UniProtKB/Swiss-Prot annotation:
Residues of the SAM domain: 543-608
UniProt entry tagged with the keyword Ubl conjugation: yes
Official protein name in the record: Sterile alpha motif domain-containing protein 11
Organism: Homo sapiens
Ranges of biased composition (kind: Polar residues): 637-646, 656-665
Span list, region Disordered: 41-77, 212-234, 251-307, 407-498, 625-681
Originating gene: SAMD11
Tissue and organ distribution: Expressed in the outer and inner nuclear layers, ganglion cell layer and rod photoreceptors of the retina (at protein level). Widely expressed, showing the highest expression in kidney, prostate and retina.
Upper classification of the organism: Eukaryota, Metazoa, Chordata, Craniata, Vertebrata
Domain of life: Eukaryota
Physiological role: Component of a Polycomb group (PcG) multiprotein PRC1-like complex, essential for establishing rod photoreceptor cell identity and function by silencing nonrod gene expression in developing rod photoreceptor cells.
């Protein structure tokens, strides 16, 4: 409105600006001119001694004619005089504002309108009042400057009130010593300019508002046409200003008690508008009528401090500006910290969402890159690009993402069984480090590598027997992805190397930690020691229902559940897909046998996975395909689980043999109990 700020006020508002602008409010408030204000508004008994001096207008007892009337209740006449003066303030305020809306600044017109609305009398006291006011202006200016707070009202109010109140009731002491010409010596425009410059210094908006409502002197500079109640002695006015300044510093609540005309809504808005900047000192005189009584803005300025706002007026949460205060931070948390906190929370939320939406293989790839970026180059160089198998594996991974198990996706690798079996883990390690010299050399090195590092990037694809790789790749990937079948601890870690991503790393797939208690890792798991031989994984997916039943029966404590597997028709294709929840709820297995079965299946698939379904997704080496039995028999049996010792201290029985029965006994290894000596079932 007056300063170009968009103000949103209720349809019926008592603020000064709305009185001017709204015809509805003008008409409604015009009725208030004749309605007596309640005593609570007019008589502020709690006022400080600055207001306690006797009125001085009726009995002349006061030292000056400018004492605020009736605030210290003395007798009936004083109270009546004060009421009339307060009403006069209302009248002059409304009438002058109506005139100012039309840019009519003619003081005589306003005064005459006031005279008409109020039955003013005693015009003969004008000269005395002017004279008295002139003297008071001279005396009060230094006192007002001390605080730098010019608690002034617009000249329109002062001029109108002066004439009407001077005419109404003047004490005989108003005609004292000063010559009459001192009174009208300052023009209203000059006085207003001085007021505007004073207000622009450091005053809060409430100061002029409060004085406007109470009819207090506007900083002692009021020209002689100010009304008598404005003129207090300099020491009294200084006390008034000090009190107002202290109230403004305490916050809006300190001023609310002293605003006689402020309704609850207006007090709230004034509280919001605390510490408003004063009007521009260079304001043009044309806007003088509308600049001073500016309505309290509904929106707080950007730099307004927010500590004084009540909790019900503050923004609802951190970092979120609202219409009431547009700075994100307030009170206990500075804006910068609030913004940083909100930014961090949003970043975490986005990262979590992205992690949930990422396909398993992409997530695994990202984890691997972040964990071992230096190993990715050799891995990619060594890994043959088999588009068909890669697509198949990715499809299996996505299908198996259904479980809540960690996303342990297998990296895409070349066909696993493309090469002969890996004779020894040591040789296998050497081969991948060399860059996969030859299928044969890579196989021996891979066997060691599988056990020790479980590197999928090794030439293990060549090392694995083709038969194993065909069905086992997708299946193993699926199992690894699923990761919920802890009982499926990888038994053919060496075979997984063929698909392994890291050719030269001793840790499986660049695990950030050497051995984690959360992973059930045998030699197959890729955590096997250098001397261990990784058991070759076998193609579980080719098992029949009888093979699965024999495998389950060969596991200690699981024989009683073979009937359930047979009834449900679980074969090699579906066995790796069984989650712990399926085994426990749908098939009625107990926790121990269920975990054991899943661990053994995982071992046969050459997969290491987190038995406890830890939510963190960790890259794991894909299952290594074990060499065919014939190849194993040729002297490459070191790959069998029997030779390979699990990190838990037990050697694993030969897992490389294709028959599940043989591996059942040997692979029935739980994280703490590998049984290398178990007979092959």
């Amino acid at each position: 409105m007056s300063k170009g700020i968009l103000q949103v006020h209720p349809p019926i508002c008592d603020c000064p600006g709305c009185r001017i602008s709204s015809p509805v409010n003008r008409g409604r408030l015009a009725d208030k001119r004749t309605v007596a204000l309640p005593a609570a508004r007019n008589l502020k008994k709690e006022r400080t001694p600055s207001f306690s001096a006797s009125d001085g207008d009726s009995d002349g007892s006061g030292p000056t004619c400018g004492r605020r009337p009736g605030l210290k209740q003395e007798d009936g006449p004083h109270i009546r005089i004060m009421k009339r003066r307060v009403h006069t303030h209302w009248d002059v305020n409304i009438s002058f504002r109506e005139a100012s809306c039309s840019q009519d600044g003619n003081l005589p017109t306003l005064i005459s309108s006031v005279h008409r609305s109020r039955h003013l009398v005693m015009p003969e006291h004008q000269s005395r009042c002017e004279f008295q006011r002139g003297s008071l202006e001279i005396g009060l200016r230094p006192a007002g400057d001390l605080l730098g707070k010019r608690l002034g009202r617009s000249p329109r109010i002062s001029s109108d009130c002066f004439s009407e109140k001077r005419a109404r009731s003047e004490s005989p002491q108003e005609a004292l010593l000063l010559p009459r010409e001192l009174g009208p010596s300052m023009a209203p425009e000059d006085h207003y300019r001085r007021l505007v410059s004073a207000l622009s210094e450091a005053s809060t908006f409430e100061d002029p508002q409060r004085l406007y409502h109470l009819g207090l002197p506007s900083h002692g500079e009021d020209p002689p046409w100010h009304d008598p109640p404005h003129h207090l002695p300099s020491h009294d006015l200084l006390r008034v200003r000090q009190e107002v300044a202290a109230a403004a510093l305490r916050g809006p609540s300190g001023l609310e008690a002293h605003l006689p005309s402020s309704t609850a809504g207006q007090r709230r808005k004034q509280g919001l508008a605390q510490h408003r900047e004063g009007a521009a000192p260079a304001a043009a005189p044309s806007f003088s009528e509308r600049e001073l009584p500016q309505p309290p803005p509904l929106l707080s300025p950007q730099n307004a401090p927010h500590v004084a706002l009540g909790p019900h007026l503050r923004p609802p949460f951190l970092g979120v500006p609202s219409a009431l205060c547009q700075t994100p931070g307030y009170g206990f948390l500075p804006p910068a910290q609030a913004e940083m906190f909100a930014w961090q929370q949003e970043l975490l939320r986005k990262q979590n969402l992205a992690r949930l939406e990422l396909p398993a293989d992409l997530l695994r790839q990202k984890e691997l890159e972040s964990a071992r970026p230096q190993l990715l180059a050799p891995e990619t160089a060594l890994r043959p690009n088999d588009g068909a198998e890669e697509l198949q594996r990715r499809g299996a991974l996505l299908v198996l993402n259904h479980g809540a198990a960690p996303l342990l996706a297998l990296p895409p690798q070349g066909p696993p069984g493309s090469g002969p079996p890996t004779p020894s883990r040591d040789s296998a390690r050497r081969a991948p480090r060399k860059g996969g010299p030859g299928p044969a050399s890579a196989r021996p090195s891979e066997s060691k590598e599988m056990t020790g590092a479980r590197l999928w990037a090794q030439d293990g694809s060549e090392d694995e027997p083709p038969k194993d790789s065909d069905g086992e790749d997708p299946e193993t990937a699926a199992v690894g992805c699923r990761g919920p079948t802890p009982g499926q601890a990888p038994a053919g870690g060496a075979g997984a190397e063929g698909k392994g991503l890291f050719p030269g790393s001793t840790l499986p797939l660049g695990f950030p930690y050497a051995v984690s208690p959360y992973f059930h890792t045998g030699a197959v798991g890729g955590l096997s020691m250098d001397g261990e031989e990784a058991p070759a994984p076998e193609d579980v997916t080719k098992w029949t229902v009888d093979d699965v039943c024999s495998f389950v029966g060969g596991l200690s404590g699981c024989g009683e559940y073979t009937r359930v597997f047979r009834e449900q028709g679980i074969d090699g294709e579906t066995l790796p897909l069984l989650t712990e929840e399926h085994l426990l709820t749908n098939m009625g297995l107990k926790l121990g046998p269920a975990l054991k079965i899943r661990a053994q299946v995982a071992r046969r698939l050459g997969r290491v996975f987190y038995v406890a379904s830890f939510p963190v997704a960790l890259p794991l080496q894909p299952p290594t395909l074990r060499a065919p039995e014939r190849e194993l028999g040729t002297g490459e049996q070191p790959l069998s689980p029997t030779t390979a010792t699990s990190p838990y201290g037990g050697g694993h029985a030969l897992a490389g043999q294709t028959s599940p029965k043989q591996e059942n006994g040997t692979l029935a290894l739980l994280p703490g109990a590998p049984d290398p000596s178990q007979p092959l079932c």
